[in-house]
Amino acid sequence: MQIDLKSCSLGMELGSTRIKAVLIDAAHTPLAQGEFTWENRLQNGIWTYPMEEVRQGVQAAYAALAADVRAKHGMALPAVGCIGVSAMMHGYLAFDENWNLLIPFRTWRNTMTAAAAAELTAAFGFNIPQRWSVAHLYQAMLNREPHLEKIAHITTLAGYLHFLLTGVNALGVGDASGMFPIDSATGQYDAAMLKKFNELAAKQGYAFDLRALLPAVLCAGADAGALTETGAKLL
């Protein structure tokens, strides 16, 4: 059965053990799916996934989805109405100004930020779990990690894939709330806590503007960009 692809939505999820791609119609009926199996690995005491496997897995899941569309509906998959990305929250992906990865991806599974989480929780008066991105960043400061000399962006796995597809450095407010506390009144990062973090960073010898490192925060329905030619080639 032929389907109206312009009214369809493509969802991609990068979970702990599978990367999944699902196509649904305007009535939210699943039409086709594809997947890629992967697993995190322990390298030098850190739970991580290689970034090249992110690309390979997304391509494989999309290819399987396209094959399923052809098998079930007898048509190619040249376009869709919209794309949504979901992935493991939290963790730490640090990049330089040209979006080169500075250190291996630190996933939410890592419990290596106890000192940072405790200090930030006390300073903010707000619970900061070890898995949160800001805890990983501050722990890197406490550890005097060399990659901080070049850091220009931090994001999550979903944020990174969104950037690869659209060129837009942004997160939905839900994902963003796993990086840094959100002010419920503004729907943006908490300004007072951002200031406190910058003050703590300065005491550690780092002149950071944390807000400049973080992705933009978008609420549901906001314009999050469009698939670029580079993003389409990735798929």
Enumerate the language-model features and the residues they cover:
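ATP-binding/phosphotransfer module of carbohydrate and carboxylate kinases, centering on a glycine-rich
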Residues: 2-3, 22, 232-233
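N-terminal phosphate-binding loop and adjacent alpha-helix
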Residues: 34-75, 119-125
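Residues within well-formed alpha-helices
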Residues: 20, 57-60, 230
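Glycine-rich phosphate-binding/catalytic subdomain of phosphoryl-transfer
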Residues: 63-235
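Short loop/turn motifs at secondary-structure junctions and domain boundaries
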Residues: 2, 12-15, 84-86
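Short glycine-rich, Thr/Ser-proximal phosphate-binding strand/loop in the N-terminal lobe
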Residues: 9, 14-52, 100-107
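N-terminal start-of-chain detector that recognizes signal peptides
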Residues: 9, 54-56, 133, 153
